[in-house]
């Protein structure tokens, strides 16, 4: 088993309040806009935590569709759905993934995405520490790093929004031409 995932499984098991899914709400308006703009019908929340954003807070009602859920550290959601999905989003997840595992992670995300990807990434150390004592944010980098990683390791071009927050607040859109081409085909 992956050492990092094992650490997160232990962390999730410690308290019901550890990573419940509360990082979706601050990003929800961006994702709702993407769902509407692309007319997305199928979604994947990549790194959903315990999923309370759907079971308790009902954020899927704002999205207009219930997404598939994936989180390798939560037994109920540890199997990655095959897809494809119109949209894939991940909020406060990428910074928890070691740099050496990012190529595989981006492959998993971008190979399944058809219309859009939204990534919200924190750029400062976490408050949380893992059972090992390490900071939960092992990859704290500015937006330029993330754009380079996406461009280098995505198996295909996908309309992508990247938002960073924390010590480096930024927002960029990649492959906007993909959306514009799709949009023009609608008329």
Locations of regions flagged by a protein language model:
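Conserved N-terminal segment of class I S-adenosyl-L-methionine
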Residues: 1-87, 103-107, 112, 123, ...
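A short beta-strand submotif of the Rossmann-like class I SAM-dependent methyltransferase core
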Residues: 87-93
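A short His-aromatic
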Residues: 96-97, 101
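Short glycine-centered segments of the SAM/dcSAM-binding site in methyltransferase folds
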Residues: 115-118
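Short "lid" loop at the C-terminus of a central beta-strand within the Rossmann-like core
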Residues: 122-128
